[in-house]
């Protein structure tokens, strides 16, 4: 007997709204001249552990007719890599190697009951990734995102061209303008329409950037909480309603700290639960080097494979085997807890406001599935519970909210980012501040070259375009972040 499908709760007029934003970005890394480049694995890992699992989960929601609206920010550098034939072919080779490794692991663990189900889980996952990537999407995940946007469940927004940290480009205003305008143009090429919103890289806002957004036809952006709370004049509704930037007409939505901490924090948030998979125990480091060598860096440097057999367990190196069923039960509990807290939050805010409050919850997309393995299923449980188990909070996008609430308070947001301590300490410090005078020099040389060769032929124009590409790629916020974090520093310096 077929189980009847539960009816969705009427969420047409909830007391308030939850706006979930998934920001997907990776730095532009493409080395066709090298047979193997470890840094390209950042993309391949994200495809396998994050993008495909999330897309598969959202497909299931659509097939089950579960109502939802989710915002995605896809950076132009990520879209460029996802649509690049060289990287697409390399991903197929990458996933084929993982399938082979998972098959070996199923054989190795067949008499190890504590690990064999997990080994099979990975094999099934890798086979699904290959099927979706090659058979379903013809190696083009961007088309899959576009399909879900056209279906009305995603709102996809853009970001700056190469994810340049815009507050660091205040002294290179032409570069900041190019980052914004090219971010819009890139989006139009992939999605066949103009973006409604723009993700400011690292949520980096400085007073005046809204005029660049207005010039590009951008309607809204997201800010960290203090960017809204310290606005002038003081925001009437805190972060629970957008502000309209003075003289620009662009809306600024503030991040909600409570919903952020619940998911971001490994110590206080859900991802630190002891039943969840341990990120740092990978067979690339645990197993014999001769066994694992064909699946790691060819020169023999140990690296992650994505196959991990242990759960967090606790603050100890003695980890217990991962049990998928236990982890999923915890994910369902945590989804219910998150929903309950948002219901109470909306109940309280709605009692104090003359409009429906909005809770903005932005996250790095790579958190879901990569850092927090159970993240995609947590999100799946949350969306289903919100559709069928309550009627206080609805899911919406920023565009949805602005359409329903076109009149909002005018104010000037405060300088801010979502980085450490809320300002620019990560991207401008003693480890990386040497790059910013170079940006100004590059901008001056680029401007001079354009003036000198304005009437030049096609070859000179190609050279100018290449100069512009190199300049934009050097401005990516990722290189400054890597220099500060102390990992892969030599690579970041070579790219900057």
Range-by-range predicted roles:
Residues 9-69, 74-117, 124, 128, ...:
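Active-site and substrate-binding clefts of carbohydrate-active enzymes
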Residues 21, 154-163, 193-201, 254, ...:
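Core alpha/beta catalytic barrel or barrel-like domain that forms the active/cofactor pocket
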Residues 71-78, 160-162, 197-206, 226, ...:
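Short, solvent-exposed turn/loop segments enriched in Gly/Ser/Thr/Pro and often Arg
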Residues 175-200, 341-353, 357-362:
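CE4/NodB-like, metal-dependent polysaccharide N-deacetylase domain
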Residues 194-205, 364-368, 488-489:
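Conserved short loop/turn motifs at secondary-structure junctions
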């Amino acid at each position: 007997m077929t189980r009847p499908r539960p009816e969705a709760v009427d969420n047409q007029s909830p007391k308030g709204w939850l706006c979930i934003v998934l920001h997907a970005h990776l730095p532009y890394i493409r080395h066709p001249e090298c047979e193997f480049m470890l840094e390209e694995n950042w993309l391949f890992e994200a495809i396998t552990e994050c993008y495909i699992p999330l897309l598969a989960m959202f497909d299931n929601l659509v097939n089950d007719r579960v109502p939802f609206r989710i915002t995605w920010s896809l950076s132009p550098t990520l879209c460029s890599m996802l649509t690049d034939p060289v990287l697409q072919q390399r991903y197929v080779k990458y996933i084929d190697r993982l399938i082979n490794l998972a098959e070996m692991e199923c054989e190795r663990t067949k008499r190890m009951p504590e690990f064999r189900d997990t080994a099979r889980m990975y094999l099934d996952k890798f086979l699904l990734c290959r099927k979706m990537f090659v058979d379903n999407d013809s190696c083009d995940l961007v088309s899959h995102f576009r399909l879900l946007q056209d279906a009305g469940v995603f709102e996809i927004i853009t970001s700056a061209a190469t994810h340049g940290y815009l507050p660091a480009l205040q002294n290179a205003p032409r570069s900041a303008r190019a980052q914004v305008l090219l971010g819009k143009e890139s989006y139009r090429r992939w999605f066949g329409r103009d973006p409604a919103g723009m993700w400011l890289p690292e949520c980096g806002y400085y007073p005046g950037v809204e005029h660049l957004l207005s010039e590009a036809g951008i309607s809204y952006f997201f800010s960290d909480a203090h960017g809204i709370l310290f606005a002038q004049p003081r925001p009437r509704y805190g972060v629970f309603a957008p502000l309209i930037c003075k003289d620009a007409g662009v809306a600024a939505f503030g991040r909600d700290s409570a919903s952020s901490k619940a998911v971001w924090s490994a110590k206080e948030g859900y991802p630190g639960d002891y039943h969840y998979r341990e990120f740092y125990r990978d067979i690339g480091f645990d197993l014999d080097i001769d066994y694992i060598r064909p699946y790691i860096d060819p020169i023999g440097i140990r690296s992650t494979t994505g196959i991990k057999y242990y759960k967090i367990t606790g603050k100890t190196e003695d980890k217990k085997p991962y049990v998928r069923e236990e982890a999923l039960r915890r994910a369902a509990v945590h989804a219910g807890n998150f929903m309950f807290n948002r219901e109470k939050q909306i109940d309280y805010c709605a009692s104090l406001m003359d409009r429906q409050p909005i809770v903005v919850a932005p996250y790095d997309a790579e958190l879901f599935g990569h850092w927090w393995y159970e993240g995609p299923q947590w999100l799946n449980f949350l969306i289903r519970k919100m559709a069928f188990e309550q009627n206080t909070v609805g899911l919406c996008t920023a565009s949805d909210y602005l359409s329903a609430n076109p009149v909002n308070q005018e104010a000037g947001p405060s300088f801010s980012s979502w980085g450490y301590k809320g300002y620019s300490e990560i991207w401008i410090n003693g480890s990386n501040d040497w790059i910013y005078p170079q940006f100004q020099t590059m901008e001056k040389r680029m401007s001079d070259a354009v003036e000198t060769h304005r009437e030049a032929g096609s070859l000179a124009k190609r050279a100018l375009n290449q100069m512009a590409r190199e300049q934009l790629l050097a401005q990516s916020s990722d290189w400054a972040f890597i220099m500060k974090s102390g990992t892969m520093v030599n690579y970041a310096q070579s790219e900057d």
